[in-house]
Amino acid sequence: MDKPNVLARVVKVLGRTGSQGQCTQVKVEFIGETSRQIIRNVKGPVRDGDILTLLESEREARRLR
């Protein structure tokens, strides 16, 4: 349970999600790993190039339709 936090850089902002558009779906690339990319939902302001601290690095969000 003592997994370290993981840093990830926002590669692309995909769109808004949530019932009222309160979350932003982004594609992130892990820093320090071999170009692994996943999709996450982010709450709050975010843009390309931002660095996020992920508490869970294995969870991936479902794609927007």
From Swiss-Prot:
Keywords: Cytoplasm, Endoplasmic reticulum, Ribonucleoprotein, Ribosomal protein. It is found in: Cytoplasm, Cytosol; Cytoplasm; Rough endoplasmic reticulum. GO terms for molecular function: structural constituent of ribosome. InterPro entries: NA-bd_OB-fold, Ribosomal_eS28, Ribosomal_eS28_CS. The keyword Membrane does not apply. GO terms for cellular component: cytoplasmic side of rough endoplasmic reticulum membrane; cytosolic small ribosomal subunit; ribosome. Belongs to the eukaryotic ribosomal protein eS28 family. This is Small ribosomal subunit protein eS28. It comes from Bombyx mori (Silk moth). The gene is RpS28.
